[in-house]
């Protein structure tokens, strides 16, 4: 027994007979770890053998009890020399294990503590009943049991569970027997009560039935109110009468076929999450449980059972009640509350959680007068923060946490005029116990003195730091306690090193670190700091070799083949650095003409050195409107000009735009904090002069620095904070306590953990500490939004007065410096095109006169006047003119342009050529230029002008043209005509890039930007992150907890992007920084376009956004026009043969059985999907108006299903009379007699799904007005079901395009099929497609069968759609040819009589570039062999073999073969 252990035995008063026993004869205390803050002493004991169980229990009891008297928690584990044991000892310790915290789970303890264990074949087996022998217990509890036994001294044991059938049967028998006894007992008690009651009733009285139901309910409710709350994490098996309290985060209500209701919901108590199920027998009972809603805090009680469908433990809820959740509150009185100056939102990429709305609302809830936004490197939360501040009545301070870098990082410091070839260099390296020159120690200084490339002298000394080295230091440097033991005093080593370095140039790799450490130690020992020249080989390498990705000592020595045997030992590092130095000097002389030390910083350091410069954080705040614009410029420059891995702001650029901005020192990654940590207060004062205020953060936020051994302990953190405050005092700069907020509540920490860890070890924050399999990243800091009270508690070590100054007084005084700024403008700023108003008006009337004559019909004249008054009066003319110019340019290139949205509601847009849709009431118009007579049908009896019967002009006898879709202008620009027009245009996908460039050409490159988007973590992605975290960090979550964690982790910014067609146009009398910063999409510096930094929706009411979209329809129309020579504008919209497609297949010459569908809708845009084909089958439309209805019904939400479909089936309404498109509501109600304003308002309420959200009073007013005008009840009820409606103008444009395509399908089928396969088909299988009808039908049947069992791939689903068209084409008598090596085109199908020849891209796996290369190569000469085809055509061996198998290559040989006789022929 060691003296130390003997002393401990005396102190805890161990019984004498035990203390003197042989058991403790070789006992020793191996290690004691003391944790003063948490008051824990952790002992590690050593014994010869495993302790008898009574010895262990006595030791544990006395040790714990003795230390408890001093308010210290004592814990221990044991190591033994001989770990032999009997099964009896094993069983005794097994039962002891369940008294330990590691094995104290309620379910594990209750199920396993009474079982028997045995040791067999190197494994401990637990004999258990069948129902607990499962993977859950194996995965979650046996590892804890194994760890506990290791702590007992048993070493590493492996545990497993084996089923004991006898035990299983006995438990079942016991359960049944016990249950039967309970039933019999209950029956007997009931019988005795009944007899007792009968005996007590007088004979003449009729006994009344006894009912104690209400009492039982009351008793149960009382029990529910008083029930003990069980943490969800403790439930691991089926249990009865469990009570939870928690937050509802997901709710789904279902109704069974029998009318019963199921409420499936999920709750969390933040220990875990649980699925719940509550049944309600009818609607009345269901209403009782309205409190079960997302965000509600509930107490629930029920039985935990395995759900047979989800296979998950689920609570069948019996009781439920709402509870009051105790939220954190800021308890300080108003006027004495803090202001958070450092807070991140979910726009901090993959780093923070709250939306800016949540952040601002939380600050307002706390009663804080203001809150700052400081996202990492971006300001994308500004617009929403601006609106949130106004909504919550709180001042929002707009800022960001910038990545500050030096523009030109020097290679040499303290440079002097010196011939580098003649200089003597001391190349040195230091090894330390950490990165802080203030908190860590030097343990080795080594140097090589070199002249003309030769080592002339060396220096190498270890230094004893006066304390044991940590394992981390030893692992990193290879230096052990033995190396430093007995070393010279540090003062002597420093003096000797200074002498060694006299009259030399110092050299180090990452010299700022080494020199900083040396200067701090020189100063500490009253020695002069370094003043001689210092060359940093790290910056030397970065500037000489900017193309290298890594410039660390290790990668450089490998690249230049310099020996480095023991990296991170100073002597080896110094010698390797010296060898590299002379390689660099030679390179600098030969390539840059560098001979003098002064030349290093002037001839080699270039303007791109910022890309490799070390990033330091700084917080930048907007003080006024000028500051806002300057910040927008800085953000733009950092993302566009100075982006390198992250958005960087060079210091000189910040200086250039600093007016109106306020600078803070940021977090532990700021340069002031770093200087205090690494060099001390004196140096930090110089650095801090650049800033306006000093930030200090709660000690908890600096705790990761402890894990990284940058700071020794909690006292060290407190000292750093005091030093930062001292820096502020010396410079008379305010010190503000900030919270570096990344989430709102402490329990949200896990969400950030999941998001951050998903970045992998490549992210700096996830770099493992130490080496080996067990190396883990530093813990993330506690970064929730702290109240004033919590913040004062964090800084209590400073004293009350100072704590209040930095937490309350200074931040509130700082807020007074901030002026109100306008982040989002209130007005629309359209670009300027000279004479745009006159041009729009002129073009409108010119076209109107051309069509309708001069003077115009009153209905036309009034409509134009009404629209132009709105368009010109609100400054919208330039939007119309720009759209017209874009459409006209595309038309000139031979493409039609389709309109989207409601622009077709504007007759002016029709007249100037933006849209083909005519919104006037249905009408006839005479095309005779000498007549131009017109007739309008204004009573609503005709839905579309295309449906008017053919008619001869009553004035001149010319056949009338027909037009007009009856769409009110109000649906485009609002009832008052002042809504910003959103003109969406569908350009051909082939022409879209040209149309985009047209925008630049019209407005100027500096005024046209792609509309920016922000991509956030999607729900499915978040789910993947949670599962990855679970896997990587050894967690196990039940499914409900995974769902909760995924829900909490979703929505965080992940990347940026661009709208597929949206282009934002800045007015040419302003600049983009008046509205938004700019950037490249997804930080792609090679992108052709810059985008708005803000999501374009945030500024869409301030600047013009043109939607220049790409679409297949215009491309298809152009292809058909090229093939046929037919002008698509001449195709009639009422062709009777085309309309037959919607009612049968006869017009195609095929039967329903042959093509598998009752109509001819396959491949027709808008009508070819399964959903719309089903609608067509049910309704059989015969008019253009009915097709518009179908288009509206198919695009709306809750317009067809459960609404119009039922009305048509029940015969209540027809396809023509149901509500189809949004505009029809307004038109119908006006025809019914409602005032236009009310008709418009009702339409707006219905189309946005707000009918049931408005007040009952408002809704009843509309209903009364409709009923007064005889609007049927079914129509009113239909309005109430709608969630979203399609614009009629959009439907009209789409249907018109669809009918043009359908025209070719009916009248020019081979052209149609050629265009369809060239443009619309997404998947091909040429072997099947060219093999004939039987092969095609067989493949379709195969895919259909797979789809029924959800086994068809996405490619097969797309292929099925293609094969439907192939099948139809073949049934109509056309042929699908084989791919032809010498005739097939690269990308387009070719017509050969009645046969289509496929292009090379139709071959699976062959891309467009290879297809074009094949065509190019064959034009240069015939392919003589497969080898030649591979080489010249750029084909893979796999593709060549596939072509060979399909017979495409004929008898082509493998290789070119030459014969002796070749030359004779």
From Swiss-Prot:
GO molecular function, one term: 3'-5' exonuclease activity
Subcellular location: Cytoplasm
Listed Pfam families: DNA_pol3_a_NI, DNA_pol3_a_NII, DNA_pol3_alpha, DNA_pol3_finger, HHH_6, PHP, RNase_T
Keyword DNA repair: no
Signal peptide segment: none
GO cellular component: cytoplasm
Superkingdom as given in the UniProt entry: Bacteria
Domain Exonuclease: residue ranges: 425-581
Top class in the EC scheme: transferase
InterPro entries reported for this sequence: DNA_pol3_alpha_NTPase_dom, DNA_pol3_finger, DNA_PolC-like_N_II, DNA_PolC-type_N_I, DnaE2/DnaE/PolC, DNAPol_HHH, DnaQ, Exonuclease_RNaseT/DNA_pol3
Keywords: Cytoplasm, DNA replication, DNA-directed DNA polymerase, Exonuclease, Hydrolase, Nuclease, Nucleotidyltransferase, Transferase
Catalytic reactions of this protein: DNA(n) + a 2'-deoxyribonucleoside 5'-triphosphate = DNA(n+1) + diphosphate
Described function: Required for replicative DNA synthesis. This DNA polymerase also exhibits 3' to 5' exonuclease activity.
Name of the molecule in the record: DNA polymerase III PolC-type
Organism phylogeny: Bacteria, Bacillati, Bacillota, Bacilli, Lactobacillales
